[in-house]
Each structure stands twice: as structure tokens, then as C-alpha cells.
Amino acid sequence: MEQEQNRAPETPPAGAPAELPFGEPLLICPGLYRVRVPLPHNPLQALNSYIVLGDETTTIIDVGFNHPACEKALDKALESLGRTWDTVEIVLTHSHPDHTGNLDRIYRDGMRVYANLHSFKEVENLMQMQANVFGPLLRKAATPQQSGLVFRKGKHRLHISAELLPLTCKPDLIYLHEGDVLRAGSFSFEVIETPGHDPWHICLYEPDRKLMIIGDHVLERITPSVSSWFPAYNALEEFLESLGKMYLYDVDLVLPAHGTPYTGLRERVMFLIAHHGERLQELYDLVAAGHDDIVSISSHAKWRYENWNEWPLDQKFFSMGETMAHLVHLVCEGKIKQTICGDEYRFELP
């Protein structure tokens, strides 16, 4: 197409800026574009939406927060590509609000929405479990200034920020599962279930072009969070098994949800496996040293940022979820044991 021929390739020439403005499509290969969508008030700063052009359809993969800036970016991208919303179908790599929230703004009646979910009710049920388990923990971890923010009145979920509230639109979902082939334009994507970062995470592999749209599963410079929101769910085991799947695919270019496209998928997978091994050992050592509850263990673990007590409440929330995931994995391996004390879970050596 003429629009594609007039656009810059994914790798910019020497001296060019590393990133284009939000909402400006960047050609990856004929028919496939990357669009940076802003994530206001979020350290990730941007989401990569991928747009696939077909003769009559426009497929958008991941859509951003429920925020006007996210809607504006996708509006700009479609206008630039000469497309309109009535041609759009949506594919979600997973349920997190930086990938799904914008549905509340862009969804139109009859729009096809694909996901590894039967219904968004599954996500709401998980949010309720989060509130039940982590509400007391967040109250304990909160500073006096943060304590009033733990719950939003009338909402059965933790109040972290407005962008993280549940979807109000309830589209019927077209269920994608392992081995399905999703056809978009001239592309045929194999669906790969990769739970761990999210129970409903999928990656999309295009074998002819050796491309992997990988969502948040394997990011080049960021370690994806892996959280357990209740102690019976071994999210880390699922994540490590999902990482192992990546060795099965011949991938020349990885298209992540955050950061720029990259190469070297298998090397990055090896790094992540080693990273989680080190984290497991660190948390085992903290339990052995007498730290026995989620808040104490989380606050003494090594994180990228110093002074855990002064962190924003949402960062404490995610750090405790990640701590829980590693502790549950250690319990499943028989290296530590778990007990219940009141409304808290305690951990100790066998």
C-alpha cells in the first residue's frame, strides 16, 4: 500500500529519535504497525498497540487505559492510516487495565473483541479475591496518609487509581485458546497461552514472518510482574512454564507491549528464569531469618527503589503480590510452609 511505502521502517536511521510521538503509526512490515499509546501517571509511560490492516478490517491489539489520552492516540493512528472505527476489531493479550481499559471509550456495538477470556466476569472475580486477601495487608502496609485510599467506597475492589477500576462496558468476547489461528489482514497468528503475568495472557506468533506479539510476557528491559492474589494459586510456576514455551518458536523479532521491538528472545527468557531463581533464594533467606508475613518480607526484599515504606500504595500492592507468588512457589516446592494467623498468612521453615 502507498501509505506503508511512505513510512519509516521500524529501525530509525542514525540520528533519528528513538520513538515517534504518541498515536503516530510506525511501520514494522507491510500491513503491520506499532502505535505508542500514553499511559498517564504510570511509570511504564507507554503501551504499544499493534495495528494490522486488512482489506476490510482493522485489527488493534491492546488498547491502553480508560483515559482520554489513550483514546486520542488511537483516534490519531486510525486517521493517519485512513481507517475508521467501524472497521475495527480488538484483540487483547491479557486482562490488565493498561491493555483493556480503553474499551470503555472505543467500544462500538457489534465490535468483535478477542481474548483468552470467556467473560470479563472472570476478571471481576479475581479483583474480589484481591480485595479479600490484600485489603488487610494494604491497610497494614499503608502510611497514615495512604490508609484512606485502600478501598473505594461502594467498590468491591482495591482502590489503587481511577485507571485500574473495572470495565463498565461488557462486550461479548470471542474466546481464543491454545493453537487457534487468528487471521488479520495477510497475517495468520498462532495463539499461545502464556499464563503467569496474568492468568489469561496470550502471545501471537506469525510463523511466515517469524514475529511474536508477546504482550507483557517477555519484555526486553523490564521484568514482568508475576503476582499471586490468593495463596492457592502458583502463578510463578505457570509463568516459568510459559517461559519454557518460548524455546519452541523461531522468532526473528519480538513485538512487546512496552519498550521497542527487540531480538534475542531465548537469551531474555534465560535471564528471566535466572532472575526468579535469585528472587526465590532471597525470599527463602528472609523467611529463614524470621520474617514471617507478607508485609515484613516485602519491605525487607531488594527492589529497584529504596525505602519501601515511602512507596506509593499501588507499588506496595504489586510488590506484595509478587512476594506472595514467590512464597507460594516455595511452599509448593516444600521449602517453606504456610499457616494462617487471623486474617494473615504466615510463612516459616518446615
Whereabouts are the PLM-identified features?
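C-terminal regulatory/interaction regions
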Residues: 2-19, 285-350
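Short Pro/Gly-enriched beta-strand edge/turn motifs at strand-loop
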Residues: 6-7, 30-37, 159-165, 185-187
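Conserved beta-strand hairpin/beta-sheet module of binuclear metal-dependent hydrolase folds
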Residues: 22-85, 203-215, 220
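Residue-level signal for inorganic ion chemistry
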Residues: 31, 258, 283, 330
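Metallo-beta-lactamase
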Residues: 58, 65-68, 158-173, 181, ...
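Active-site HxH/HxHxD metal-binding segment of metal-dependent hydrolases
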Residues: 66-71, 77-182
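Active-site/pore-lining binding-face segments in mid-to-C-terminal subdomains
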Residues: 73, 81, 95, 99-100, ...
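Histidine-centered divalent metal-coordination motifs
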Residues: 93-99, 197, 258, 326
